[in-house]
Regions:
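Active-site-adjacent pocket-lining segments in enzyme domains
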Residues: 3-35, 43, 55-196
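Membrane-interfacial amphipathic helices and adjacent loop/beta segments
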Residues: 43-51
């Protein structure tokens, strides 16, 4: 593993541009390289456009080739990207075997061992919902739109006065409500990265 401090961000079509832009400014300004990864379907690279069509990213790092030991943490970007990444071309008989879900399982194992940070924001807990074993018993925050998905997958959504809280931390899992929380989310995520 190199001495360069790096974080991994999983991304796909329909990602949230606000988060994308803030990640690209905040983390490098605080000493971290940001690497984007997606499932490339056998291609050398793929380009993805954000929800509002104001940002585009070309990714050449396939999820199936990621070595999590190269990173201190991983963020699942918001928007609809994680819904796309949990897609399986053929349904498995047991648990979801999409490459992104398998990578998340590895990340959660490292996170639970106290060696890795995982962050989600807005709708990106959808990737956790693909395998309820990943979310069961954890407290999180998320977009109101996916509240039922998260609860049905075994998560406990933290609320205050009928709204999900802005940012919540459960061990090394940091969750943010929506893009409006991205600055607060980034600060909490960075603080945890720096303690590893």
């Amino acid at each position: 593993m190199s001495n360069t401090k790096k974080i991994l961000v999983l991304i796909e079509e329909h990602f949230d541009e606000t988060e994308y832009n803030v990640f690209n400014e905040f983390f490098p300004a605080n000493g971290y390289e940001v690497h984007y990864s997606s499932f490339l379907w056998g291609n050398d690279s793929l380009s993805f456009e954000g929800n509002d069509k104001t940002a585009k990213v070309t990714v050449d790092l396939c999820i199936s080739k990621v070595d999590l030991d190269d990173y201190k943490g991983m963020i699942l970007i918001g928007g609809y990207a994680m819904d796309r990444l949990r897609y399986e071309p053929k349904l498995s008989s047991s648990t979801n075997q999409a490459p992104a879900v398998n990578l998340l399982r590895q990340a959660v194992t490292k996170m639970d061992a106290g060696k890795f940070c995982v962050g989600t924001i807005c709708h990106s807990l959808w990737l956790f919902c693909a395998d309820p074993g990943l979310l069961r018993g954890r407290s999180v925050t998320c977009a109101h739109n996916i509240y039922c998905d998260v609860v049905n997958a075994g998560g406990t959504v933290v609320q205050n006065n009928g709204e999900t809280v802005e940012v919540h931390q459960d061990g090394l899992l940091i969750t943010g409500r929506h893009p409006g929380a991205v600055h607060a989310f980034d600060k909490v995520f960075l603080a945890q990265l720096n303690q590893l």
